[in-house]
Amino acid sequence: MVLSAADKTNVKAAWSKVGGNAGDFGAEALERMFLGFPTTKTYFPHFDLSHGSAQVKAHGKKVGDALTLAVGHLDDLPGALSNLSDLHAHKLRVDPVNFKLLSHCLLSTLAVHLPNDFTPAVHASLDKFLSTVSTVLTSKYR
């Protein structure tokens, strides 16, 4: 999926509102995913998955940092996310459907925290962005 110029503008503007909360929003999205889609917990058997756990917060920071990196490289997502794609495909072997589930939870989290900025156009752009990130992260599964 190709991001239009308007999509890129919307994604950058929305992510600028996220600011220093990217890790917190990432952790909240993970918690939403674990609650809404309990099978996703199987990838984290060594984690304390309780609300506010240090491990979920740390992984949420990784998610937030990766998305911040992606927002900064919208014109070269495959290059920017190559190492993460390798990690998830070859070492962690995460089922690709889980990226879609996390994307859904990220959109919900952003909608809750940025209600005035989460317009239909921004929602559509963020959805396309997260879908593109998911595609890039699963590209090395083949």
Swiss-Prot record:
Entry keyword annotation includes Transferase: no
Keywords per UniProt: Acetylation, Heme, Iron, Metal-binding, Oxygen transport, Phosphoprotein, Transport
One biological process term in Gene Ontology: hydrogen peroxide catabolic process
Residue list for modification N6-succinyllysine: K8, K12, K17, K41
Alphabetical list of InterPro entries matching this protein: Globin, Globin-like_sf, Globin/Proto, Hemoglobin_a-typ, Hemoglobin_oxygen_transport, Hemoglobin_pi
Function according to Swiss-Prot or TrEMBL: Involved in oxygen transport from the lung to the various peripheral tissues.
Binding positions (O2): H59
Source organism: Equus hemionus kulan
Entry binding sites for heme b: H88
Name the record gives this protein: Hemoglobin subunit alpha-1/2
Phosphoserine found at: S4, S50, S103, S125, S139
Presence of keyword Electron transport: no
Top-level division of the source organism's lineage: Eukaryota
Cellular compartments per GO CC: blood microparticle; haptoglobin-hemoglobin complex; hemoglobin complex
Family to which this protein belongs: Belongs to the globin family.
Residues where Phosphothreonine is found: T9, T109, T135, T138
Domain called Globin: residue spans: 2-142
GO molecular function, a single term: iron ion binding
SUPFAM superfamilies in UniProt: Globin-like
Modified sites of kind N6-acetyllysine: K17
Subunit organization: Heterotetramer of two alpha chains and two beta chains.
Annotated tissue distribution: Red blood cells.
